[in-house]
Structures are given as structure tokens and as C-alpha cells.
């Protein structure tokens, strides 16, 4: 299905924009309400379409430049194109709609938001490990079987990369930096990248989940 134009009606839980096209509900990430978008379908069902924003045809005046170079490809976060104060407003409205739609609670009162720092706040992450894009094995055919197998494993492991899944995909988005990770977790991510490059991690490893506590005078950083 070729790209088609939609106008984003609102944001929903998870950060996707919601629109409609020829009777189908359309979900598009990394957009804002009232934006006109050329949407490229990546999954099509009878009643809904998941799409990627191929082009922002008419941008919201609220849109800002994302801090992270991976934003728009990486599926690790959804709101960097929105000012932080407005992110909180959208999330409060999403909660209000969820209460109404699922809980049958029509809450018209204020919803207090508890803001955290907009950057370097995430102290839990799930990183995926997959072969680097374009990686191919190159093992000397003259080596004996044992050495060849060891060399193959070492080279294959060294060509793995670490990051997050791409948005709406199970393909890897390898990252060298992450603006929302707590500093202790970013340090761990970079150390794991180096360990992969050395072939120092188990070949079968495909996912790492981490939880970090930031260092204080009374409590050193731990992972």
C-alpha cells in the first residue's frame, strides 16, 4: 500500500497519533494533533493500519527538534518532539480518556502531574542484542575444525550490537547514546558495547534488562 495523507486527531496511550483513512483507524508514532502527515503503512488489518510518518506535510507549531539522533527510528521513547510541559498535558488527557473509555469514569476534575527531569531519568531499561547491520562471518577455511568453530563464534559475537527495537519493529536500532537514560545506565550500555566488540559476552545473549540507582554520597551507583 502506498503512502497516504492523514490528519492526526489526537494522541493515544503509548504516544501514537490516531487518525482515520478510508474507514480504518490509523496509528502513527512521532506526530502531534492537527498535523498533516504522509503515512507509510507497515501493518494493515481489516480495521486498523499501523504506519510510519514518511513526511510531515504540515507541522504543529508546538513541534520541537528532538535531542536524540535516534529519535524517530528507535522505539525506546515517543515524545521528544513535544515540549515537556505539553507532554504532561497530553498524558493527563490520555489518562482522562482511558478512565472514560475503559473504567466508565467521566472525570472532569484536575489531574495532578508529578514531573520528573525530562532527561537522564530512566533507571530501568531493556536492551536487545542482535547482529550488526550487514555483519557477515569471515573465518579462515584452512583452520582445523575446533579452531574454526572457536573463531567463528568469536567473530560472530564481536559483530553483535546493542540497542532498542526500532519503532513498531523487531529490528535493532543500535545506539551509542541515550538522552533519557540515567548516567549509571548509560555507562553500563557503553561498557556492554565494548564487551560485545571484544567478543567477551555469551554468543546466545539476546536481551539484557537493567535497573540502576544513581550514586549519592551515602550510596554508590550500583547495577
Question: Which residue ranges define each predicted feature?
Answer:
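Accessory RNA-recognition modules of RNA-modification enzymes
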Residues: 1-223
